Every structure is written in structure tokens, then in C-alpha cells.
Design a protein with these regions (language model features):
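A compositional/biophysical signature of low hydrophobicity enriched in polar/charged and small residues
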Residues: 1-258
């Protein structure tokens, strides 16, 4: 695992649908070299696959997040799990109402102990007019999150530009997203999450390293990447300079179930 491999992984972590041509340009290697390296990362089990994340808004649901300090495993209807070195595990929960989410967190707490952190993003509205084609695009991408636009268009018998435009809108409005599943231990990279109430300042500091974020105007959780622990420590120190109360968790495993 060298610096080129790490840059490839970073590109995939930031955008699970990024094209190999774009990765090659970003990293500064040929398409042939990139293809060889990606195939090796897959065969070595570093790149494990890709997951399509679908916003709960599409099902009329709400979500909340809670972190527990426990080494026990809990799989009671969660939307994602991120396990951290500090024996803290962050879970995502979804429900039809906020009361349902709170009850799911309480149920987890009865097994794992009281949560050390909870975050409930404010309920938002879908900011685009969805149609049946959008639902069909999502259906196909559940089976293959990186399916090329040309293949989606062919399967749905729709114009290429129509599919490209609708897919870009779904991604832009964060109604869907594609997450690369990376073996963090084998990949020798660091992913860490930061929960902060100084979210605007922290977001600005961490923008170059941010993979994705769940936030509103007052607080948020940012998931960030570093090529090594030294870089992660430096970024965390900068965060502490603007928010001494920020919660930091270094991830060693993550799973998405939506």
C-alpha cells in the first residue's frame, strides 16, 4: 500500500461513483495503471464493494444518531454502524416519527448503556419533484451503485441526458449517495468522525479531508479521511482550536444497511 493507492482510496471514499478516468486524472497516473491498481485492491480485499445510501426522506422517515461506549454488538434495526478505536460505536436509526427513533435509541441503550452522544437532524423537505423514472433509477442502483448512466438509460429505455440530469439531481439533493466499502485496517488509512456545535468553522477547516457530513446550521457529524495518524492528529488539533468540546472518534470499521 503506497501513497498512490491511498490517493485512489480517498477519491473513491469522497465519491463512490467517480469514474476511473477522473481518478486517473486526479492521481496523475494512466488509465491502464489505475485499472491494475484497482483490480489489485479488490483482489486483496481492500475495496470490498459499494453501497447505495437512500435518504429516509424518500420513505417519509426521519433519522437520528447515537454513540455508545460499549464493545458489544447491536444490530437492532440500525441504518449504519461505525466502530471506533475508543470502544465507541456510532449508530444510525430511522423511523416514521421522531418518537420511533428515540424508542430505537432507548432500546439500544438498554443493551449498550446510556448513549454518550445523540444527534437529531431537523426534519427537511425533499427539494426536487420526484417522478417514476427517479424511483426506477434508484431501484437499479440498489443492485449496482456504480452502474454507468449509459447502462441505466438502456435498461429504462430513456434518453441518456434525461437519466444523467435526474441522477445528478438525486445526488445534488442528497437523496441518494454511493459509499465505497473499504477495509480500513488492510488499507492502512484513517477515517475519523467529528461531532461539533461549531459546525461552520469545523466544516471549513476539514473540507479537503471530508468524505461526507450530516449537519444542520447548529451542529453536525463530519466523516473525514487521512493518509496516516499523524495527519489525522494535526487535523483534530485544528478542530480543537475552534471547538474544544468537539467529540472525535477514529473509525476502524463501518457498515451501511440502507
Amino acid at each position: 500500500m503506497d501513497q498512490v493507492d491511498k490517493k485512489i482510496l480517498f477519491n473513491l471514499l469522497r465519491d463512490g461513483r467517480i469514474s476511473q478516468r477522473q481518478i486517473a486524472q486526479n492521481v496523475g497516473i494512466s488509465a491502464q495503471t489505475l485499472g491494475y491498481r484497482i483490480n489489485r485492491l479488490i483482489s486483496d480485499g481492500i475495496i470490498k464493494g459499494y453501497s447505495l445510501i437512500v435518504s429516509p426522506l424518500l420513505d417519509g422517515q426521519v433519522e437520528g444518531f447515537a454513540a455508545f461506549k460499549s464493545d458489544r454488538q447491536y444490530n437492532g434495526g440500525v441504518s449504519f454502524i461505525t466502530r471506533c478505536l475508543e470502544e465507541i460505536t456510532l449508530y444510525g436509526f430511522r423511523g416514521d416519527r421522531m418518537e420511533d427513533v428515540e424508542e430505537k435509541i432507548a432500546a439500544a441503550g438498554r443493551e449498550l448503556g446510556d448513549p454518550v452522544m445523540k444527534y437529531f437532524p431537523p426534519t427537511a423537505q425533499v427539494e426536487m419533484n420526484l417522478n417514476s423514472n427517479d424511483m426506477e433509477i434508484i431501484r437499479l442502483m440498489r443492485g449496482d451503485p456504480r452502474m454507468p448512466v449509459t447502462d441505466i438509460a438502456a435498461k429504462l429505455d430513456l434518453p441518456y441526458m434525461t437519466v444523467k440530469r435526474r441522477l445528478n439531481l438525486l445526488l445534488k439533493n442528497r437523496l441518494i449517495g454511493v459509499v465505497s466499502q473499504i477495509d480500513l485496517s488492510g488499507g492502512d488509512v484513517v477515517i475519523y468522525s467529528i461531532f461539533s456545535h461549531a459546525v461552520d468553522a469545523v466544516t471549513k477547516l476539514l473540507e479537503p479531508q471530508t468524505i461526507f457530513a450530516i449537519r444542520d446550521s447548529t451542529a453536525g457529524v463530519l466523516f473525514c479521511y487521512s493518509e496516516n495518524l499523524k495527519g489525522a492528529r494535526e487535523s483534530i488539533s485544528r478542530v480543537r482550536s475552534v471547538d474544544s468540546d468537539a467529540d472525535v472518534m477514529v473509525l476502524y470499521e463501518y457498515q451501511f444497511f440502507t
